[in-house]
């Protein structure tokens, strides 16, 4: 008994130092199970290790089985109320998955580690919805085209499938300044919400034709990248203040204090390419700079594309010009449906420096409702070799990178 007491009375600082030498989530869980005191002292999610995990949604209808792959280890996480065929993954941030429930239009945040969920405002509350009639089967939505103001009708299932391109969150939902931002519509517009908001609010831009491909939260700003690789910056605090006004605005006002297009023009090299065949991602770095990752795609067969190559550009803090990068040095990046992030692998055996971890985020392909191949892998920038991940497996719900 005295031996057990010595373990349970271990100082929290020393216990935390032990966790710093654990790179496997499996080992971390086993450490928490040593005794009740350790289980209560250690959080359910390790907050010091950020290894990229690949979430592989199961394919069965009535058992919502997810597999988290960490090198050779696979962890099984059960969500009793999660139907793979009725959910679209549209984001992964801070250990949370963001999904759209096709049948009802709910937008749900799921935590695979704690098995908790939180709802964001539903799809029916997006700014392009004029009216929603849930009882009008096949004609539930009256919508407005934000580009030319044309009014049209659409059935609920189609709208729920195609409305959301991607959602990222600023922090875990228990933070007071929590905010979510969505890229929505085929034309790639931005909308935001706070926790407990009833609806989404549009963020306007001076350029009506702007088509955003990626968005992140970084240093109290929202950065968004459009299909022409133009960078936009918005002030998160100013937007939060606008959302807190009474009555609640239908859209964030087009104010200079909100932000807009940055002065840094797109990299000249990219003007040579047909930009629609690219996926663009923006990433915040620990030194305050921004990275732009451009993924070039080749169409291998009908409704399937594969990565051809990557271009990496860097925008230093206070700079107005992107510079070409040939190395990520001691860092790695992770892109896809997840919030685009930079990682420091350190000595971790599960994450390698100077590598790009990528998954597919082709929204149109993923809303067809049938299994399909996914373009995902790990690229070594040093020798440009790519390790494809499960290239011959078809998925109903696309795999997604996840950071605890």
Region annotations inferred by a language model:
Residues 1-10:
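CRL adaptor-proximal regions
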Residues 3-4, 67-70, 82, 88-91, ...:
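C-terminal closing repeat unit and adjoining cap/tail of repeat-based domains
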Residues 12, 27-46, 61:
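Short helix-loop-helix/strand-helix junction enriched in hydrophobic and basic residues
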Residues 43, 70, 112, 195, ...:
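Inter-blade boundary loops/turns of WD-repeat beta-propellers
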Residues 50-58, 62-70:
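An edge-strand/N-cap motif at the start of beta-rich repeat modules
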Residues 62-66, 107-109, 190-192, 231-233, ...:
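Hydrophobic beta-strand positions in blades of beta-propellers and related beta-sheet-rich domains
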Residues 83-300:
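A sequence/structural signal of beta-propeller blade repeats
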């Amino acid at each position: 008994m005295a031996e057990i007491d010595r373990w349970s009375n271990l100082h929290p600082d020393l216990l935390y130092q032990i966790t710093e030498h654990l790179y496997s989530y499996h080992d971390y869980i086993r450490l928490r199970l040593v005794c009740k005191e350790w289980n209560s002292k250690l959080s359910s999610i390790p907050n010091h290790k950020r290894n990229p995990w690949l979430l592989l949604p199961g394919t069965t209808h009535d058992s919502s089985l997810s597999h988290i792959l960490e090198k050779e280890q696979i962890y099984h996480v059960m969500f009793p109320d999660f139907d793979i065929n009725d959910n679209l993954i549209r984001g992964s941030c801070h250990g949370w998955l963001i999904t759209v429930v096709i049948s009802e239009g709910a937008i749900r945040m799921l935590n695979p580690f704690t098995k908790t969920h939180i709802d964001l405002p539903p799809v029916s509350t997006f700014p392009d919805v004029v009216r929603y009639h849930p009882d009008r089967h096949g004609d539930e939505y009256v919508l407005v085209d934000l580009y030319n103001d044309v009014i049209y009708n659409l059935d609920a299932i189609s709208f729920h499938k195609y409305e959301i391109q991607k959602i990222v969150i600023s922090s875990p939902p228990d933070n007071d300044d929590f905010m979510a931002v969505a890229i929505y519509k085929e034309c790639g517009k931005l909308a935001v919400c706070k926790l407990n908001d009833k609806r989404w609010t549009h963020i306007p831009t001076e350029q009506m034709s702007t088509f955003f491909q990626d968005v992140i939260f970084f240093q109290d700003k929202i950065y968004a990248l459009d299909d022409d690789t133009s960078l936009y910056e918005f002030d998160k605090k100013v937007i939060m203040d606008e959302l807190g006004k009474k009555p609640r605005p239908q859209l964030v006002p087009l104010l200079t204090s909100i932000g807009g297009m940055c002065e840094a023009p797109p990299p000249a090299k990219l003007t040579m390419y047909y930009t629609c065949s690219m996926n663009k991602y923006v990433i915040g770095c620990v030194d305050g700079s921004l990275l732009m990752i451009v993924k070039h795609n080749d169409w291998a067969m009908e409704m399937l594309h594969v990565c051809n190559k990557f271009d990496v550009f860097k925008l230093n803090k206070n700079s107005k010009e992107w510079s070409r990068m040939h190395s990520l040095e001691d860092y790695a990046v992770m892109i896809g449906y997840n919030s685009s992030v930079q990682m420091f692998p350190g000595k971790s055996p599960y994450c390698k420096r100077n590598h790009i971890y990528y998954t597919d985020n082709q929204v149109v392909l993923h809303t067809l409702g049938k299994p399909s191949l996914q373009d995902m892998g790990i690229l070594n920038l040093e020798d440009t070799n790519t390790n494809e991940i499960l290239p011959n497996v078809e998925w109903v719900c696309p795999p997604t990178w996840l950071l605890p």
